[in-house]
């Protein structure tokens, strides 16, 4: 009977595990690499945000921006997206932005608005037409943005298609580089035959957790 129990246990396939001694060594290695600046998080313009994130955006992390409708989540992410490129020029990185709420054209419009210190209402000649000089500045600034390694997905998609697209970028365009994935926002993700929004968000979280590993 004891022999039978041992044989049955041989068929058990447990989850991967590690002893705390291994985790402790990994923690010390990480701390040493941070001290020696071998690992440097990506900076934003906001010191408080950087401090809350232990110095900035780190690899292998998922960050969730939460707020009521109209509180500026999309504007914050748009600015952060620009900062990651401009303030971390010593890093090779690619930004993949699932921009489901706002067309990529409008995303760039916000960047132009920020850089030129003009509202989008002014840029779009809603009240008064832009002068030729102002239009030239818009064109020059837009040309500089074309070199940024940012890729937009405008069309809302299912969780599976989002997963497929992230995997494609990991294996091709962003191979051996930082890949920053941005999704705005979760409620616009199409259903994969899930019954409610909570299931969609849950599956989406699984995709992001898998991608960060």
Residue ranges of predicted features:
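P-loop NTPase motor core
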Residues: 26-106, 154-213
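Short, small/acidic-rich helices and loops at N termini and domain boundaries
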Residues: 1-35, 71, 93
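Charged, low-complexity C-terminal accessory regions
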Residues: 1, 120, 165-167
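Charge-rich, solvent-exposed alpha-helical interaction surfaces
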Residues: 3-6, 144, 165
